């Protein structure tokens, strides 16, 4: 993380000790976030973005399957009037294994970051960029033990 303060929460206690909160429930969040950064459930991702845009002062970033850019319903609901400032495509596949970390995992699924700028720097257009390969460069011996 490159922020001065990172606060995590979750909807259920998975043993990490995070404060519990249903992010999608109306009302005040547990804290005033500058950024909301999440990998939401695919079917609820638009809800997470809309809620994030309500509460964040800096921006919202969601990691979702790249096909999330498709769909007339999502376009009408979100992209038409609230397009992201950036769509950042991972050029290598990002394997995600439920409940654990497996450095040997592979996937056929492509992922992108969709990023909204709430702070006012955004000019209204959506920029597309590529995230270069980094998995091998960033991997460290011991990662599997730390995150398994």
Positions of the model-derived regions?
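Class I S-adenosyl-L-methionine-dependent methyltransferase catalytic core
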Residues: 1-148
């Amino acid at each position: 993380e490159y922020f001065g303060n990172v606060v995590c929460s979750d909807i259920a206690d998975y043993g990490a000790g995070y404060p519990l909160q249903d992010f999608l429930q109306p009302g005040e969040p547990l804290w005033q976030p500058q950024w909301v950064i999440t990998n939401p459930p695919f079917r609820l991702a638009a809800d997470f973005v809309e809620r994030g845009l309500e509460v964040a002062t800096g921006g919202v970033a969601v990691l979702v399957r790249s096909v999330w850019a498709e769909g007339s319903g999502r376009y009408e609901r979100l992209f038409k009037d609230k397009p992201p400032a950036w769509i950042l495509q991972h050029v290598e596949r990002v394997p995600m294994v439920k409940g654990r970390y497996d450095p040997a995992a592979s996937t056929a699924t492509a992922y992108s970051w969709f990023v909204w700028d709430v702070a006012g720097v955004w000019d209204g257009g959506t920029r597309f960029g590529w995230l270069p390969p980094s998995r091998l460069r960033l991997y460290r011996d011991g990662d599997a033990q730390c995150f398994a």
